[in-house]
């Protein structure tokens, strides 16, 4: 246990979950690996200080409850208070797509990008069917599962999610134009930059930027220098608007430009045609003669790393791979 988090030592929450170590941080609060002391099972625990200026873990826990049972939505074990924290106990998952992108030397093959795109579209669609938009679609918020779920992609971090329509009446939230940017500027839709209320189309457009980030290794509006955060957002917005989709997607299959143009063309209240978007990439996948065998780029690397470790140590130990493998 690192001395810096000494206060968390022997910290047991929900009567049976013992904190082990910090494994990450979400939009609000830190994530810890914990063990269920009754059966030895590993879980993830999200902690938020009760003194937080804008507490949102209770909100996030309610959202997870609404989404429970969806494919690729982590299962919630417990929500409550412990010491001076709000506590959310959930399934332990594997590394994020950002972790895996780095693990693969920031290069994904087209096969991997297309297999991911299929699952990512489905995860966002599911959240939308439950009347919410995510509003922070980025590689860090998509995690691979572990064990028998190791090929399944999970969507996490619903701290910024918002209800976009009424459950009963299906009444859509009204169009507004005075909003501050919510989410991560790098992947934000153009309309989000312009202060327009977000809706389903914005989650889909953000996904388009995530896919091109994987294809290109970086986006043209990354690494822009500015004195203030506001000025940086301005610069990102300007660069995004002045980069034609065709330029952004140059050198890659036309389907990526088709995807982005489709998303940008959606009206505020319009439901995206998720099946059309999945089919776009599925047909491309087949055209490229790939097999949908869940062999991702990191699957190969993990196997190589494990083999090297086994041969060098004479034992079948796992080599150092991102946390959660």
Swiss-Prot record:
Task: Cite the EC number.
Answer: 2.7.11.1
Q: Which PROSITE patterns match?
A: PROTEIN_KINASE_ATP, PROTEIN_KINASE_DOM, PROTEIN_KINASE_ST
Which positions bear N6-acetyllysine? 8
Keywords annotated in UniProt: Acetylation, ATP-binding, Cell cycle, Cell division, Cell projection, Centromere, Chromosome, Cytoplasm, Cytoskeleton, Kinase, Kinetochore, Mitosis, Nucleotide-binding, Nucleus, Phosphoprotein, Serine/threonine-protein kinase, Transferase, Wnt signaling pathway
Q: What region holds the Protein kinase domain?
A: 17-285
Positions modified as N-acetylalanine?
2
Q: Where is the active site?
A: 136
Where on this chain does ATP bind? 23-31, 46
Keyword Amino-acid biosynthesis tagged:
no
What is any one GO biological process for this UniProt entry? signal transduction
What superkingdom heads the lineage?
Eukaryota
List the catalysed reactions. L-seryl-[protein] + ATP = O-phospho-L-seryl-[protein] + ADP + H(+); L-threonyl-[protein] + ATP = O-phospho-L-threonyl-[protein] + ADP + H(+)
Where on the chain is Phosphoserine found, per UniProt? 4
Give any Gene Ontology cellular component.
Answer: centrosome
> Which PANTHER family does this chain map to?
CASEIN KINASE-RELATED (PTHR11909)
Function according to Swiss-Prot or TrEMBL: Casein kinases are operationally defined by their preferential utilization of acidic proteins such as caseins as substrates. Can phosphorylate a large number of proteins. Participates in Wnt signaling. Phosphorylates CTNNB1 at 'Ser-45'. May phosphorylate PER1 and PER2. May play a role in segregating chromosomes during mitosis. May play a role in keratin cytoskeleton disassembly and thereby, it may regulate epithelial cell migration. Acts as a positive regulator of mTORC1 and mTORC2 signaling in response to nutrients by mediating phosphorylation of DEPTOR inhibitor.
Subunit organization: Interacts with the Axin complex. Interacts with TUT1, leading to TUT1 phosphorylation. Interacts with FAM83A, FAM83B, FAM83C, FAM83D, FAM83E, FAM83F, FAM83G and FAM83H (via DUF1669). Interaction with FAM83H recruits CSNK1A1 to keratin filaments.
Give the protein name, as stated in the record: Casein kinase I isoform alpha
Species source reads Rattus norvegicus
- Write the lineage as a comma-separated list: Eukaryota, Metazoa, Chordata, Craniata, Vertebrata
């Amino acid at each position: 246990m690192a001395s810096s988090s000494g206060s968390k030592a022997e910290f047991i929450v929900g009567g049976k979950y013992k904190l082990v170590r910090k494994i990450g941080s979400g939009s609000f609060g830190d994530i810890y690996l914990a063990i269920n002391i009754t059966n030895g099972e590993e879980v993830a625990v999200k902690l938020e200080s009760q003194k937080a200026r804008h507490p949102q873990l209770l909100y996030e826990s309610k959202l997870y409850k609404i989404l429970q049972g969806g494919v690729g939505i982590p299962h919630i074990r417990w929500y409550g208070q412990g010491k001076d924290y709000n506590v959310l106990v959930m399934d332990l998952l594997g590394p994020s797509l950002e972790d895996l992108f780095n693990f693969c030397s920031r290069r994904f093959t087209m096969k991997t990008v297309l297999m991911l795109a299929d699952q990512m579209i489905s995860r966002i669609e599911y959240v939308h069917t439950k009347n919410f938009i995510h509003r922070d679609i980025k590689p860090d918020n998509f995690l691979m599962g572990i064990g028998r779920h190791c090929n399944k992609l999970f969507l996490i971090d619903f701290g910024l999610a918002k209800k976009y329509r009424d459950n009963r009446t299906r009444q859509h939230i009204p169009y507004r134009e005075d909003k501050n940017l919510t989410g991560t500027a790098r992947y934000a839709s153009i309309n989000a930059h312009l202060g327009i209320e977000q809706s389903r189309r914005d989650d889909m457009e953000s996904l388009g930027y995530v896919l091109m980030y994987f294809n290109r290794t970086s986006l043209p509006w990354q690494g822009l220098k500015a004195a203030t955060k506001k000025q940086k957002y301005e610069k990102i917005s300007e660069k995004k608007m002045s980069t034609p989709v065709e330029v952004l997607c140059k050198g890659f299959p036309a389907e990526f430009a088709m995807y982005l143009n489709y998303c940008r063309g959606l009206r505020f209240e319009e439901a995206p045609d998720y099946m059309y978007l999945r089919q776009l990439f599925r047909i491309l996948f087949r055209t490229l003669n790939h097999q949908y065998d869940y062999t991702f780029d990191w699957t190969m690397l993990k196997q190589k790393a494990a083999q090297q470790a086994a041969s060098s140590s004479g034992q079948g130990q796992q080599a150092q791979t991102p946390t959660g493998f």
